[in-house]
Design a protein with these regions (language model features):
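Conserved "HGTGT" condensation-loop signature of ketosynthase/thiolase-family condensing enzymes
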Residues: 1-77, 93, 97-98, 108-157
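A short, glycine-/small-residue-rich helix N-cap motif at loop->alpha-helix starts
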Residues: 84-85
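Flexible, low-hydrophobicity surface segments
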Residues: 101-104
Length: 157
């Protein structure tokens, strides 16, 4: 196995609601900072992979516009996982292990304030039996929480 190291990290300031900037405007300075800190010239990054959840953004193919923050010109080797940054990191690690590339840029993002999370997250449910009920996240969690409380009270936990 090849040794792999994370040589740089950058993160946008976490905000409860961001109304003044879109995902590209949030990502661009973060990606630029991470690349600059790495000391690896951008043209030498062999692979770029992102992780995000289009459901959370409330729009299909949200990751495509995020490529503007990376700067996909000249053409780059790029991939996207519809999951969090840990899965994107894993994909980059696999690519590095194959020896196909020597460096990778991994980033993940999510901006729930683009849509109403209560309405958007419902779209991830089974489209035939559960989603039509219009169950919000709190109501969906209630049976599980009631079961957990019951287990704790019984002393079986």
């Amino acid at each position: 196995m090849r040794e792999v190291a994370i040589v740089s990290f950058a993160q946008a300031k976490a905000k409860r609601r961001e109304l003044d900037a879109n995902e590209v405007e949030i990502l661009m300075p973060v990606v630029q900072e991470a690349v600059a800190r790495s000391g690896i010239p951008k043209r030498e990054i062999g692979f770029t992979v992102s992780g995000s959840c289009d459901y959370v953004a409330g729009q299909p193919f949200a990751f495509v516009s995020a490529l503007d923050a990376v700067g996909a010109w000249p053409p780059i080797s790029e991939s996207h996982v519809e999951m969090d940054g840990a899965f994107a990191l894993y994909e980059a690690w696999v690519k590095l292990q194959t020896g196909e590339v020597d460096s990778a840029l991994v980033y993940s993002f999510g901006k729930t304030s683009m849509g109403d999370p209560a309405a958007v997250l419902n779209l991830q449910l089974d489209p035939y039996t559960v989603a039509p009920l219009g169950i919000d996240a709190v109501s969906l969690a209630a049976p599980s929480l009631i079961g957990q409380q019951s287990c704790l009270r019984s002393g079986d936990a």
